[in-house]
Amino acid sequence: MKPDAHHVKQFLLRLQDDICQTLSAVDGANFIEDSWRREAGGGGRSRVLRNGGIFEQAGVNFSHVHGDAMPASATAHRPELAGRSFEAMGVSLVVHPHNPYIPTSHANVRFFIAEKPGADPVWWFGGGFDLTPYYGFEEDAVHWHRTARDLCQPFGDDVYPRYKKWCDDYFFLKHRNEQRGIGGLFFDDLNTPDFDHCFAFMQAVGNGYTEAYLPIVERRKAMVWGERERNFQLYRRGRYVEFNLVWDRGTLFGLQTGGRTESILMSMPPLVRWEYDWQPEAGSPEAALSEFIQVRDWI
C-alpha cells in the first residue's frame, strides 16, 4: 500500500481524543482545547488539563503542518528532501502528576512524508513512550516494560530490545551523566518493510501508552506524601526541563524553525526547583533513585 497521510491523520486525531477521554475519566477534570493555525500551512489542537484530582498538568498535543519546501536546516542532513513538499503530523503528550509516587510519563507518535512529481515519496514513522519516576517501584517498572515488550512482540522478537536500547540512549542527560528515567520505547526513521507494517506498529505504540501508564497511576494515587516528597519531585523535575531544553531534538527543532512555542513547551512541568549541589541523605528513598534509574533489563 502507498503511504496514506490522510489515514494516519485520522488515527492521530482519534488517538488524541481517546487519550484525553481516558485521562479525564481517571482524574475527574476536563481538558481545555486550544486550536491553532500555522500561517505557512497546517495547524493543530493543544489540550491541557490543569490542577486535576490526580494530574497537576497533562498536555496532549496534535499537530499537522505542511509546506511547499522544507527549511534549509532540515534538508542540510537529508539532501533527498530538497525540492519536495512535505507533511509532518503527530500526537505528543506529557503527564505531570501531583503525587510524587506517581511517575511522570511521556509519549509521542509521528509521521513525515515528502513528495515531488515523478519521484517516490520519502516517508517515515517515529515515536515511543518513556517513564520518569521520582520514587522507584520495581513492579511499576516491570509492568511498563512488559507492556512495551508485548506490543512489540507481533512485529518481531528483536523489536523491543532494539527500541528499548534506543530509548535508554536517547533519554540520557550527558551533562549530568544520568538517565532521565527508566525508558521504554523509542524509534525513528521507520519505513521498512512497508507502509502498512510501519503504520500498524505506530498504532500499537500509541494505543499501548495508556495500558502501560494507567495501572501505575491506580496503584500509586492513594499513597500519602508530604513536603519532603514534594520537594524532591520538584527538584527532579529540573532534570526533565534540562533534558527538554538542552538535548531533546524535537523541542530544539521546533523552537529553531519557528514552531508554536506554547505547544512545544507544553511538556514543561508547571512547578520546578533547582538547588545548588543538593545531595540526598545517604540510605534515603531519594538516594535510591539514582540506582533505580540505571539502565537494566526489567523483564
From Swiss-Prot:
Protein localization: Cytoplasm
The EC number(s) this enzyme carries: 1.3.3.3
Entries under SUPFAM superfamilies matching the protein: Coproporphyrinogen III oxidase
Organism superkingdom: Bacteria
GO cellular component terms, semicolon-separated: cytoplasm
Catalytic activity: coproporphyrinogen III + O2 + 2 H(+) = protoporphyrinogen IX + 2 CO2 + 2 H2O
Record-listed a divalent metal cation binding positions: 96, 106, 145, 175
Site (Important for dimerization): 175
Ranges for region Important for dimerization: 240-275
InterPro entries for this protein: Coprogen_oxidase_aer (IPR001260), Coprogen_oxidase_aer_sf (IPR036406), Coprogen_oxidase_CS (IPR018375)
A single GO molecular function term of this UniProt record: protein homodimerization activity
Catalytic site positions: 106
Main localisation: cytoplasm
PROSITE patterns (UniProt xref): COPROGEN_OXIDASE
Cofactor: a divalent metal cation
Keywords on record: Cytoplasm, Heme biosynthesis, Metal-binding, Oxidoreductase, Porphyrin biosynthesis
Annotated positions binding substrate: 92, 108-110, 258-260
GO BP terms: protoporphyrinogen IX biosynthetic process
Recorded metabolic or biological pathway in which this protein acts: Porphyrin-containing compound metabolism; protoporphyrin-IX biosynthesis; protoporphyrinogen-IX from coproporphyrinogen-III (O2 route): step 1/1
Similarity remark: Belongs to the aerobic coproporphyrinogen-III oxidase family.
Subunit structure: Homodimer.
PANTHER family, per the entry: COPROPORPHYRINOGEN III OXIDASE, MITOCHONDRIAL (PTHR10755), OXYGEN-DEPENDENT COPROPORPHYRINOGEN-III OXIDASE, MITOCHONDRIAL (PTHR10755:SF0)
Task of the protein: Involved in the heme biosynthesis. Catalyzes the aerobic oxidative decarboxylation of propionate groups of rings A and B of coproporphyrinogen-III to yield the vinyl groups in protoporphyrinogen-IX.
This protein's name: Oxygen-dependent coproporphyrinogen-III oxidase
Organism, scientific name: Salmonella typhi
Upper classification of the organism: Bacteria, Pseudomonadati, Pseudomonadota, Gammaproteobacteria, Enterobacterales
UniProt gene name: hemF
